[in-house]
């Protein structure tokens, strides 16, 4: 169903889920019920006021009742009234005070934060009389690039170009180019301090959902029931456990210890024993355990004299347990806080919600006992129905909620502090705007989030366009990387079509860092009250009495009532959804085992689209497909018309999905061409008989249908199970799974044409392949990610041949002439920047050529390429330590001596090239920062020509480094005179089982000969037989082998050599960026050993294993040379007094050596030792342990 997939990507972008998430978060006029507005409405500043307003302390306002309203009014469980919070367009407040709208590229160039102002409407009510309202700015929030408030959104971009007198009549792509953007950039990231950062999606357990499992306790297993109760940003774990003696106890957050279930249910208002029994029991086998727990609660030892019988008794028991010895008022407050706020907060926080909580606890106990009795299995934590995905908007929700509450609390404090009866309330000066802004920016720039999570915000990977898209679609698990977590890392059946089965890192992150599949959608959530109203209209009744025949109905994990015919209810909900009368965000499932109807409408569910089947036929028909092709209807219309529906993992348990509607015959019955799915068109979807049309001869023929009446849905395209990166691999179904995982990792490291605005991007580092090519063997998914416009590789002519041992162990032999013609050449860019900072006291940095009187000034030749302003000329050649930006700064500290009275000498603080790099100055950017100080960015380029040690990889995980560069005249050649660009070792194929590599070589050979692209899409690519027939047709052997001759001797090879054309990727692991050696250089201050690392001109570590090899050889002097002379060898003077043995010191006044302990001055000897030994001795002395050195004559 290529047309449907085309329509999907025409409607939705590749990172649409992230954009939708932030669009629903931002408070814009067209989104009055935004997440931001909901947070404002739910924010509670103090206990004496409801959410949405706060009351100033009457003691500080002269007894006046002054209320500040910032949220909407709540009526009948709904918020009504006008929107109170708004977010504007991205802007920057210049040092002059003017506010200007900015573009993402300006933010990158000037190291700015890409922020939009947030304004809040506040109403002041004094003694019941409204004094008016005021709209004030409360801070700034980061703007997601390409979201609806971004400057690049269609409406905003038109206004920006018009305001700046830009050209008219431009297309969308031309407008984006005009403002310095790549038209194919997907967006979905933020710009903080000029750096692009992405909020990576987080996988978490579903809130408000009961989970039952077995847990190990002291060599025995106990049944545990848990629920992560979440409401308004507050999350609390309530757990229930059945002991070995049958007692059921509940753990409540915020209090230590456990509470017996029956006592807690009675404290919540379920006073009668029969009500407690009915709330728990579902089968007669449970009754003995329930009765036992009820009887235990009535034991006089629990609460003298008669045990717990009433709600008052239960409250008394809780007071005795958790607030013993406190005043009555404090006890009441403590228990109310525990029952109303800490226990199951998602069910409400008022005393009227206690009965609901008691019934919910009964349901938890029922699930626990069902597990104990074997009626139900333990819940699978790795099932996607029990997971929720937190997108950028959800994570920003947590951050904004915390920051906004801080702002409101601070506003209350400031108003109480500055209140003056005569002047009245002055809100604007009391608001500290930086509080919200800095709180959010700190989290965004460091990745440290609310709740102690780290790494939530990451620097966007810009190595290639593919790596960028992959990073934006990544999903990470919060589980610790050091633990095995085997089940969590494994593929789960519910991940089919939702999570890519191949794209995951190797190592400790394997299976915990995942990527979304191609056709996915993450629900934004809808108001459960609206769903509840519809369900009530379908005869869902909220009654306490339960009949075994009635089905229990749950909405978002919360029990809402019963229905007489649960199967009918489920079919009715689906009918309403498919007809468009109910939101397509709603998913429903009937659990046959427990007779439960589970309805979900919450946010964070990962869903995928499927074609709906009725009576073994698709609802989709030919008319819909034709209208889709001509753009008359969209993918969304197919959902509204009931042809396609989005299913979450919960509802998919109720379905029977067909993978294919039909099997394709090997050959066309009319033209005898080999057929494959890309070259066959399904003419009559929606009919029982299936008619196909051949893509070669356009003749039609019938095939039997594979669909049965039991099938409920049909896959749109099985190729959509893969993620973005794995989808560009041709013929992946012919490779072993680990190779696809490796290939996915390699593709993200490949160099190519990452962004079209590369010349004006000030990235810290970047790569550009000189001649990127479109792969000859391609997949359909490349069209959706615009891979042809942003390729990352080249087509190589490859011979599979051992060559003198130089391509052993995955090494590659490469043709020198091909390199000279430009094969594999790339440019590496590095940007250096400097700013004229201003310091307290009026001092500032200055761009200039430092003169000889400047402290630390270099020799004149280092400044030879600078102009008069201290900035280097474009296209100047620079090498390691050359100055790029001449800069002087005021002294760091006050200087001592006579010079303190004279003028201060400035110090040299120029920006220089990295020591091991060289290149040409590609670009010089001059701009100003937010504080109006000058900023200079120098972009240096260096050419990277393939050399020994550079890494290349095919799209099948066959990676290798260049082992030999051979002149063309010495390379083997075919009888047609074809000289390969690359010689690949045949031993790399058998054990790795990368048959796709061989098929791509054959396909590339045919594509080169015929001028047509070969389709290698997973499950639907051109078959091997078709490729081999094409080889014969164009004069090659069926096996693709050729006669080859040795370029050195001219003799024919005894074996025929497999030759083909395959797409190779140059990876960013290059020798020029890694090679390093030193003879002398800096040492560490503490240990006096050479520094570590290339960037610090460090030495190469001579480790323990290397030392052991020299010991084995008996090379004592070599050991001394490596570990002492060339490391931290030092001379110590030691007191020779037999009773002393301390290290001597040098007496400057007398010019002699003496022992500081015994005073000896004559008997002192030099010894050669490692400085690390002296350091260890000094540290032992600091512990009060002295090490005496005993000297002896060398023998």
Swiss-Prot record:
Xref: Gene3D superfamilies: 2.40.50.150, 3.90.1100.10, DNA-directed RNA polymerase, subunit 2, domain 6, RNA polymerase alpha subunit dimerisation domain, RNA polymerase Rpb2, domain 2
- Coiled-coil residues are none
- Cite a single GO BP annotation: DNA-templated transcription
Q: What is its main location?
A: cytoplasm
Chain positions recorded as Zn(2+) binding sites: 1135, 1140, 1155, 1158
Which residue stretches does the UniProt record annotate as biased composition, category Basic and acidic residues? 894-909
Q: Could you confirm whether the keyword Zinc appears in this record? A: yes
Protein localization: Cytoplasm
PROSITE patterns for the chain: RNA_POL_BETA
What cofactors does the UniProt entry give for this protein? Answer: Zn(2+)
Gene Ontology CC, one term: DNA-directed RNA polymerase complex
Matching NCBIfam families: PRK08565.1 (NF006335), PRK09606.1 (NF007175), rpoB_arch (TIGR03670)
This chain's function reads: DNA-dependent RNA polymerase (RNAP) catalyzes the transcription of DNA into RNA using the four ribonucleoside triphosphates as substrates. This subunit is involved in DNA promoter recognition.
Subunit structure as annotated in this protein's UniProt entry: Part of the RNA polymerase complex.
Protein name according to UniProt:
DNA-directed RNA polymerase subunit Rpo2
What is the originating organism of this protein? Answer: Thermoplasma acidophilum (strain ATCC 25905 / DSM 1728 / JCM 9062 / NBRC 15155 / AMRC-C165)
Tell me the lineage of the source organism. Archaea, Methanobacteriati, Thermoplasmatota, Thermoplasmata, Thermoplasmatales
Name of the coding gene: rpo2
